[in-house]
Amino acid sequence: MRQKLLAAGLGNEVLVDSAGTHAWHRGEPPDPRSVTHAQRRGYELTGLRARPVTQADFESCDFILAMDWDNLTLLEEMCPPQHRTKLGRLSQHARQSKAPVIPDPYQGGAAGFEHVLDLVEDACDGFVEFLRQKKDARRVGTS
């Protein structure tokens, strides 16, 4: 997401973060297979560490995008009612794929990781375009 925002000229306007709905892997780096497949596409994940979603995230974030329905449901349960409009699925922004969710890659071997990266890239492209359109609409509305 960060690289796509930078390429779109939005890198200095959007803070990207990642968090999980469970604290099982708190403080751990990404799975080595994720790192390897991401690096093949030019993405650097080595500085990332797992952390759980916190109540502060619901306050400070403009968008909180889940990868699948189960995680979206957990986020809805955790989220204060006044912030539920910030929640959604990353896949709803996909431009090519019609997959309703981005699946867990861990059971699909190398092909599973590549498929998930394809889905994430497509959805991130769509989300960046969504943000660009929102920015353009604000600019037109204030002119």
Predicted regions and their residues:
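Short polar/charged helix/loop
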Residues: 1-143
